[in-house]
Amino acid sequence: QETEFKVRYRVDGVLRTERSLPKHMQNMITARIKIMGNLNITENRIPQDGRIKTNINFQQIDIRLSTLPTVYGEKIVMRILDASNVATDISKIGFTEKNEQLFRKMIANPNGIVLITGPTGSGKSSTLYAALSELNVEGVNIITVEDPVEYQMSGINQIQVKEEVGLTFAAGLRSILRQDPDIVMIGEIRDLETAQIATRASLTGHLVLSTLHTNSAVESISRLHDMGIEPFLITSSLIGSMAQRLVRRVCRDCGQTVPATEREKEIFAENGLDVTTIRRGIGCSACNQTGYRGRLAIHEILPIDRTVKDLILARASANTIHDYMKQQGYHSLLQDGLIKVLEGSTTTEEVLRVATTE
């Protein structure tokens, strides 16, 4: 800011101010962080990206740096990547029993594409890493192309995208296919070329895992079509799509059972669920008076069965496919979230914050 220097933390997806420091400390702190990240401390006119590796309590912590010049000096974002917190077990991601079975069935296929969709910060990478951990067994060749490589995994060959030297997702993927892979993970399908190569790879005997930025599982089909992938290729290659969001967990220390409001009862009834009580955190020192501590994922899974393939080939709208999902008993993001409210894991407000009502 113009007269002060703010330090803010994003905890469980919510940004809060930790403290404000005198303006004269800004340049000193900025320079020190840039030195630690091997950045050019004399360059403050352009954005820079760096990395700090450190050990805290005998745990290796990776910190990603991003600097940005603003009118009041450089802004720095430090993203903490703690390898010890990476989910290596699909059962610990927060799936309902039905969704866990659906997801395991999708990634058990020997070939095809499995897509995980959602906005930035929705836990897509963590879910991909959990899937890779379970698939990473003796006799399986797994190669990934990522931007960036967030967590280094033993037994998996990981490629870092470097667009400045021409190593794009598409270029990396073309090279990967000459390396005899069984499973390929693409950090993100961003363009038509990457989508085409991923589709081709899935049709030639490879299991491809990747992510897309769409709001729902159904919209991933529309996105591939909008990129230029023909419907017959989508139906031939796509195994399934899963949308994901993160919601805050009710604090274990201060969570209390309270009666549901009339509005909550209406929302649950509209989604075929009954509710009388929910759990809500009242705030304590453990959760910094927020009532929440930690996060869990809510999901929406669309397996591509014969009927869905016919709908895709007929260029049916996303709403038509969504209606079919409801008829088959598949849960939307909202319904999955409300089920987790009933379990006492989160609150209705959290679910409505990330999942739209229909």
Feature map (PLM): residue ranges:
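Short, flexible helix-loop junctions that flank or precede catalytic/ligand sites
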Residues: 1-358
